[in-house]
Design a protein with these regions (language model features):
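Active-site core of metal-dependent hydrolases
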Residues: 1-62, 80
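His/Asp/Glu-enriched, well-ordered alpha-helical/loop segment
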Residues: 41-111
């Protein structure tokens, strides 16, 4: 698992995909800390798995998964400068990121 992953190079994306690394995207934390916006749509189109997280209280003033999902959608629209996003970033795509069973299962095994 890779947390945040805001500035991945094409080589990084290749390595992540080759080794099955998935990204945990924390949009509220990234906004709160002014870290930037991860190009989630590009990562999904490249075949990477992306989950949504809320990060911790030190870098986020609330732990609200629905707010994180909503902000992820809005930030991806802003960075794409386009309201209709790809199927990866529509409401169902964002819900899949929030509830990816394969990834959740691997986290449970690691804990």
């Amino acid at each position: 698992m890779s947390i945040h992953s805001l500035l991945l190079s094409p080589e990084d994306i290749y390595i992540y995909k080759k080794h099955g690394v998935f990204i945990n995207h924390n949009p509220e934390s990234n906004a709160y800390l002014a870290s930037g916006v991860a190009p989630v749509s590009s990562y999904l189109q490249a075949g990477l798995s992306v989950t949504i997280g809320t990060d911790g209280a030190a870098s986020n003033d609330r732990i609200d998964m629905l707010a994180a999902m909503r902000l992820m959608s809005h930030l991806q629209k802003v960075t794409a400068l386009n309201v209709p996003l790809s199927k990866e970033m529509n409401s169902w795509g964002i819900l899949r990121c929030a509830t990816n069973r394969r990834i959740a299962k691997s986290i449970f095994i690691l804990c």
